[in-house]
Amino acid sequence: EFDVLYHDMLKDHTFHLELAVKFFLARHAGELPFREWLGPNSADRLDRKLERLLSHQLELSQTPAGQQALKTAGIVKCEPQVRVAGMLFYPEQQKAWSHGLNPDHPTGDWFHIGKFRQRSDEHWQWRLLEKPYWLDADYENARPLDERQLDRAELRPVMLINKHLERCFVVPDD
């Protein structure tokens, strides 16, 4: 299944655009290979996502089923493109990097729940962003953070936002 097929009328050219919106956390500071960037649930990894995009999803237009779908839509030829959006999160305000990443990518920080709780009363400046709103960055509509919601980070990662629209993940200590 194609994410997007579009036609550039000025160039008279059709494109197959694959889209991915992901959030990855650096396992530690410093230079990292893509396999060291984990999704919030730790099952997803940046290297695997990129491999799937490049070796499977971008190749859809070259498969027999993809060729048939294009033919049915009246498209003879299309050029594949990929667009990856989202954010990369760094451990406790430390920097990490990987060759091939846009140096201007959106960033945030991540904290273990124990360290986050030690940040005096500063953590009450944050609000909880439920997963459907991770891209939204809307502080006013995010849920005010209370102890019960913060306790959720003992079990699974949660994304928070502050009034400066900075986002962070708080993750279990283990």
Positions of predicted regions on the chain:
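Intrinsically disordered, low-complexity Ser/Thr/Pro/Gly-rich regulatory segments
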Residues: E1-D174
